[in-house]
Swiss-Prot record:
GO cellular component: cytoplasm; nuclear speck; nucleus
Gene: SRY
DNA-binding region: 54-122
Name this polypeptide is given: Sex-determining region Y protein
Subunit structure as annotated in this protein's UniProt entry: Interacts with CALM, EP300, HDAC3, KPNB1, ZNF208 isoform KRAB-O, PARP1, SLC9A3R2 and WT1. The interaction with EP300 modulates its DNA-binding activity. The interaction with KPNB1 is sensitive to dissociation by Ran in the GTP-bound form. Interaction with PARP1 impaired its DNA-binding activity.
Role according to the record: Transcriptional regulator that controls a genetic switch in male development. It is necessary and sufficient for initiating male sex determination by directing the development of supporting cell precursors (pre-Sertoli cells) as Sertoli rather than granulosa cells. Involved in different aspects of gene regulation including promoter activation or repression. Binds to the DNA consensus sequence 5'-[AT]AACAA[AT]-3'. SRY HMG box recognizes DNA by partial intercalation in the minor groove and promotes DNA bending. Also involved in pre-mRNA splicing.
Disulphide-bridged cysteine pairs: none
Any one GO molecular function term: DNA-binding transcription activator activity, RNA polymerase II-specific
Family designation: Belongs to the SRY family.
Length: 201
């Protein structure tokens, strides 16, 4: 099933021929006889797998890297995917424009096929749940001040802000923290190492 790879396999002419042969033989965009999971990977109907979205068409780098990633993974089975990606990025940058041209042409062809198959398609990136949680926690942390009475951190009400930059904590004005004081906050515990200073009157 696997073949040995020698140095001649990396010549630009062989790489171009391999990628075009691979695309014709294996791309589901060339044929319509793939499984539901394969169609999902190439932008087909994904309802069987619980995903109801169309994937973006592959760009030139992705077209090139699909075959290259397999080769690198076979040559270096212990190499992590992140390291393979770095290596592929470097290798792609080292290719000349002439060597990249067939992959740009293939990507253009795939884009045209994608446009014909999904005429109303518009790329809509989804925000990951983890990113949304991190953004919400950053917003909450940026609007908290230490409570002078208990040493705990409490969110400030929006109405409690004064024009001079002072805030209210438990109904009493509190001077905002300086940059040095802000660094003393310990995000891991959420507590302050210093009590609030009363606002100047």
């Amino acid at each position: 099933m696997f073949r040995t790879v020698n140095g001649e396999d990396y010549s630009p002419a062989v790489q171009q021929r391999n990628i075009l042969d691979f695309g014709k033989a294996h791309s589901l965009l060339w044929t319509d006889n793939g499984s539901a999971n394969d169609r999902c990977e190439t932008g087909g109907n994904c309802r069987e797998s619980g995903q109801d979205r169309v994937k973006r068409p592959m760009n030139a780098f992705i077209v090139w890297s699909r075959d290259q990633r397999r080769k690198v993974a076979l040559e270096n089975p212990q190499m992590q995917n992140s390291e393979i990606s770095k290596r592929l990025g470097y290798d792609w940058k080292m290719l000349t424009e002439a060597e990249k041209q067939p992959f740009f042409e293939e990507a253009q062809r795939l884009r045209a096929m994608h446009r014909d198959k999904y005429p109303g398609y518009k790329y809509r990136p989804r925000r990951k749940a983890k990113e949304a949680t991190e953004i919400a926690s950053r917003r909450l942390f940026s609007t908290v001040q230490p409570n002078a009475h208990r040493g705990a951190v409490v969110p400030l009400p929006i109405q409690g802000r004064l024009r001079q930059g002072h805030t209210f904590t438990n109904g009493k004005p509190v001077k905002p923290l300086t940059a040095h004081e802000h660094k003393q906050l310990t995000p891991a515990t959420g507590a302050s190492q210093q009590l609030d200073k009363p606002a100047p009157q």
